[in-house]
Amino acid sequence: MAKTAFKGAPVTLAGEFVKVGTSAPEFTLVKGDLSNYTLKDGKGKYLILNIFPSLDTGVCATSVRKFNQLAANQPNTVVLAISKDLPFAQGRFCTTEGISNVIPLSDYRYTSDFAEKYGVLMTDGPLTGLLARSVVVVDPEGKVCLLYTSPSPR
């Protein structure tokens, strides 16, 4: 089991983090229009998976704003903002904040399938059931080429 921390206290994660050099696990997440988005939808492009607990936290909201700025100048790259927030809340946030260069996706519908495959589901602590803050980059061939996990999500 992988570990992270919340405000200095250890938090257990379901499974293990994906590994650099391995094939990215397939996933199905929910878009704002309630349709599905899968790993195959990004085939042939770099995918940046910005994974976080909730847009209702300052640090997570800031990360989405920053990735939105960076995504504007990245050819052949798609940035996915992934949380357990409902698609309606994600859409409201993106509209209010002028976020248009990232795709907000929710892991609410499929019983944490994505979170478990990527090793980011918090299984204890005050944020149990939410996603641990991390970034995964998938290359155009579908391989994980970079992984960052936050040592202490706030």
Segments predicted by a language model, with ranges:
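Short loop/turn microsegments at loop-to-beta-strand junctions
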Residues: 24-25, 48, 132-134
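A short beta-strand-turn-helix
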Residues: 28-46
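Short active-site neighborhood of thiol/selenol oxidoreductases, capturing the structured segment around
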Residues: 40-58
